[in-house]
Amino acid sequence: MQNQTFTAADIRARRAETPRPRDRDFAESLGISEAALVAAYCGKGVTRIDAHPDVVMEAAQDLGEVMALTRNASCVHEKVGVYDNYHPGNHAAMILTEDIDLRIFPSRWQHAFLVERDGDAATQCSLQVFDAAGDAVHKIFLRDGSDHKAFAQMTRTMASDNQSPEAQFADRAPVEAAKIAEDKIDILRKEWARLTDTHQFLRLVSKLKMNRLGAYRAAGLPLARQLSPDAVDALLINLQSSGTEVMLFVGNHGCIQIHTGALHTLKPMGPWQNVMDPGFNLHLRRDEVAEVWAVDKPTQRGTATSVEAFDARGALIFQVFGVPKEGRDSRPAFRAIVEDLQEVPA
């Protein structure tokens, strides 16, 4: 368990002294989890609720149009839309709408809170979910047109029995570095070539005692081509200028959020590359991109080409694919853009 050196009162006092940083940054500066910071305000604008996706998604569907946020250490993915079409599952669940498209892993949803905070102009309301270590898994932010009455009712009807501001969190598991089984590389290449669906890939590499990044390094050309980290900017710029539609995945071990469509407005700022489109924002720390791969996987509908970025620890930052939908197939255009991206210097 994490060493909780600060009481909830200590955390609130420190926060009052330093109100400007975002929750994640402030919690990191204090050496606590983000969920510990949120929990410290239970009874003071924060209500602890059941974190199971079945509960959270049922509530989310009553809120109307909201902003969905899923992030990892290097990338933030924000989509505006309505939660609907929820598909429950013990291992994996989904929200499938045109605007909000989520892959949910219920075992990671361990702590959840309804949060009300005074903002510059109005009270900001959100539903925030965290994993066992207190790291954010998924957040839902109400907008002006959201159903604020439904949210207020949730604070009364969904409140857990335990509303203590003190909470315990597990130690954060380290990121798994690239894992390669040298004696199984030939098997990897042969089995990879026989794939018929991209979802079979992780089962294959797990069976061979490897992981995603390890498999890319092991397989090499023509299945996986390492690109320069600078290729990420080139990719986004070319997608924006060409209007090519993509599926852009950003996630963590508890939730993956997907945007499908074109990228219209890029606004770089310092180390950040930002997509600032109506209904979709992306915030990417370019300086934390350490390794980039262009990957081909065979499927029944043709080759699925992706560009995938990793940080220095080996954690996946994002994936980009062409859109494979009938009548809206952008894969050839996407593949042409990827083929022109700069490879990593030899």
Give short role names for the model-derived ranges.
Residues M1-A122, A346:
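An N-terminus-focused feature that recognizes amino-terminal "leader" regions
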Residues M1-S33, G243-I256, G261-L263, K267-A346:
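C-terminal functional regions that serve as terminal interaction/effector modules
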Residues M1-T5, R15-E17, M94, D101-L202, ...:
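Hydrophobic, ordered structural segments
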Residues A16-Y41, A181-Q226:
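N-terminal, charged amphipathic alpha-helical interaction modules
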Residues C42-N72, A224-G254, P298-T303:
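DNA polymerase processivity clamps
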Residues C75-V76, G134-H138, I256, G314-F318:
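Short loop/beta submotifs within extracellular cysteine-rich repeat domains
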